């Protein structure tokens, strides 16, 4: 999918395509906050495999590693990169401030919306599905509109990053080294689900990944300690949504 997107943008002959590498995410309270290698190095893979496309259209592909967790270092790197484009340091500084404000606003909106949905679940005696996945799983073309499908079954959908923000969200005892940003949120979300009977955890999984093998085992352990079900949907192995519907439907029967 990314090849099609990059090819389309290169064909429009922009000044450049901006796709930075980001190896660390926000601090989630773990031993570290790395992004997984796939997310971090995807731009490097694109550069290595699509260089002919960039040459064909004369498109510059900018994919620097950016330390988003270190604003001062980030500012220096951005000044150097955008100097040829006549973008001043003050403009970059203003852009950084706006970006940070936008991120904080998004986090607040996510927190408030998650609280609202949790309250609605409690008041209306609904089933809530905490739908966990990688950032790219937010794309309907990748998630096969599974969130909509769950809604159609009369269940609420929440994201693991929203659940991880809740005040009583915490890390359970872990056997693994907790150093990956997304995994950290998933562990906390799994523990939260085990302590709330009206919630269930469903993870979207798109490819065989060594890191996912580790996190799957750990989350399974967290859930099983309180006799809770853990569902991992390998959505790239089948487009049969009928089969995917079975597990969410089973939750309604278990509570009947």
What do the predicted segments below correspond to?
Residues 1-5, 252-256:
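Conserved small/polar residues in nucleotide/adenosyl-binding loops
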Residues 3-11, 164-211:
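Glycine-rich, anion-gripping cofactor-binding loops and their flanking helix/strand elements
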